Amino acid sequence: MKWLVESVINHLNTVLPSNIVYAPIKANVLDVGTNNEPRKSIALRIIPAAPGQQYFEGETIRKQFQILVKSPNGLEAMSSIEAIADELHNLHMHSFHSIDDSYNLITLEKYVEPNWVDKTEANEQIYTALFSVELEIGGN
């Protein structure tokens, strides 16, 4: 869902400092580094989710997404994913900087805590966290 990806990226770029969002946030994939040139990278990808609830006057949309961060400095990657997860968890209770009002954010919650994923051949550390979102079409 393009709106969700662009809105979350916009929100994170608006509220978090550059030492947390230390690379451009891309959709779906992390940049690939080499042994001679490791690369810092942040990615957001939509992952499978159950359908939303049906209501008398419409329905909600449920989406889940994963944020991955990668850096040759493991502490930098860990600090970044923890700050991103803290910012996004229960975001529906705060101000959400979406790209437009096509959807109304009902809930946005972290459902898997930040954790280590892997170390690449270029000695980059990858961390991730998973989030669940419920949206209503035609926000306010």
Language-model segment annotations:
Residues 89-134, 138:
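Acidic-leaning, charged glycine-interspersed low-complexity segments
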Residues 59-75, 125-137:
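Oligomerization/assembly interface segments of phage tail-like spikes and tubes
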Residues 72-93:
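Mid-chain, well-packed structural core segment of small domains
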Residues 1-57, 91-97:
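Small/polar-rich, solvent-exposed N-terminal microdomains that initiate assembly or binding
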Residues 54, 77, 139-140:
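Short acidic, gly/pro-rich beta-turn/loop elements at beta-sheet edges
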Residues 8, 12, 42-44, 67, ...:
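Hydrophobic beta-strand residues in large extracellular and virion-surface proteins
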Residues 35-37, 60, 101, 124:
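A generic structural signal for short, non-catalytic loop/turn and secondary-structure boundary residues
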